[in-house]
């Protein structure tokens, strides 16, 4: 039987291929249920994934439509694909440092939307700086819901996990982890990010950085939101 992940993939492909364009109406829950022969809950779960990826939006009185596309879709192989495929955490000459794990209240609108939480809800944040041949290239920030951390104990203390968290989560729970579409956008770097990337810029100078993000789900909803902040000119890992 088709599941929510397959339904999300079907519509994601239609949106990215241009078969569905910004402003186009999505099938109603009932229409999509009939189309795929599934119950309404499965369709809602699939639509929630697409909403978390910024691909569709729901508005009172207007139903669900395809969203505008300010983000760039990242294609090809990324660090997570490499880890799943080869078991290698790092590419040649790559490592990471500054691993930290902390409990915090979430206020970032993008994180709250992706994880379907309210501003101020408690999350677990894992931070590390990736380096290529000793030079910082990106800051990795992973935001986890508390239920995720309960199942993946390797998040404790140093924040180093033995393997991909999705595999660990599946081993502990039996639930499959679905990785959403990775997208990118530009924004201004925080001072902490400037320091971690060792950018030599005058104090208080605005620095534009490329930010990629992806959200993970299981059958019960969002699990984690991962963000990588790249130094200007840095190459996104693709092997």
Where are these regions (language model features)?
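Catalytic-core "active-site belt" of small-molecule-metabolizing enzymes
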Residues: 108-120, 125, 129-143
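Short helix->loop/beta-hairpin flanking segments within DNA-binding domains
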Residues: 6-24
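HTH-adjacent hinge/linker in prokaryotic transcriptional regulators
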Residues: 2-8, 34-35, 42-122, 149-161, ...
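Generic short beta-strand segments
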Residues: 102-106, 127-129, 212-215
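A short alpha-helical element within helix-turn-helix/winged-helix DNA-binding domains
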Residues: 18, 23-36
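C-terminal regulatory/effector modules of DNA-binding transcriptional regulators
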Residues: 117-118, 135, 146-239
């Amino acid at each position: 039987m088709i599941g929510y992940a397959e339904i999300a993939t079907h519509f994601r492909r239609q949106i990215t291929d241009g078969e569905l364009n910004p402003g186009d109406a999505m099938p109603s829950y009932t229409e999509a249920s009939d189309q795929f022969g599934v119950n309404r809950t499965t369709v809602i779960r699939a639509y929630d994934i697409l909403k978390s990826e910024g691909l569709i939006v729901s508005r009172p009185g207007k139903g669900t439509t395809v969203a505008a596309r300010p983000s760039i879709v990242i294609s090809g192989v990324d660090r997570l694909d490499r880890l799943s495929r080869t078991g290698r955490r790092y590419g040649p000459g790559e490592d990471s440092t500054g691993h930290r794990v902390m409990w915090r209240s979430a206020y970032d609108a993008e994180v709250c939307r992706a994880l379907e939480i309210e501003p101020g809800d408690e999350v677990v944040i894992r931070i590390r700086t990736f380096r290529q041949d000793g030079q910082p290239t990106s800051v990795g920030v992973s935001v986890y819901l508390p239920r995720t951390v309960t199942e993946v104990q390797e998040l404790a203390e140093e924040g180093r996990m033995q393997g991909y968290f999705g595999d660990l989560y599946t081993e502990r729970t039996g639930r499959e982890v679905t990785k959403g579409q990775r997208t990118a956008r530009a924004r201004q770097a925080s001072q902490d990010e400037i320091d971690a990337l060792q950018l030599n810029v005058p104090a208080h100078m605005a620095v534009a950085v490329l930010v990629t993000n992806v959200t993970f789900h299981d059958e019960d909803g969002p699990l984690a939101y991962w963000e990588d902040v790249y130094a200007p000119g840095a190459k996104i890992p693709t092997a």
